């Protein structure tokens, strides 16, 4: 199961941290071990790490976002144009 790390900017870090939307959107995909990160020098820059059982489904959720994904990102104050996703790779 690959680990995925995404980072992006948010409008309100405390709101983003407290939001249940990550679990609501990613939980049904089987995503587990969700961890959040904040840049201590610029708290509007945040990251989230996941263990993802179906990478194709996960990446597809961002490539062709459904209304619930768009609504969750808007609710959380995510600035989608700043989103970068990294996928764990091992030699």
Name what the model sees in each region:
Residues 1-91:
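Short S/T/G/P-rich N-terminal loop/turn motif that feeds into the first structured element of a domain
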């Amino acid at each position: 199961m690959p680990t995925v790390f995404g980072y992006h900017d948010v409008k309100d870090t405390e709101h983003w941290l407290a939001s249940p939307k990550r679990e609501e959107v990613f939980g049904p995909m089987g995503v587990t071990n969700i961890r959040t990160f904040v840049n201590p020098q610029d708290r509007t820059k945040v990251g989230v790490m996941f263990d993802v059982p179906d990478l194709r489904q996960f990446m597809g959720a961002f490539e062709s976002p459904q209304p619930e994904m768009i609504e969750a990102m808007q609710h959380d104050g995510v600035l989608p144009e700043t989103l970068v996703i990294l996928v764990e790779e091992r030699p």
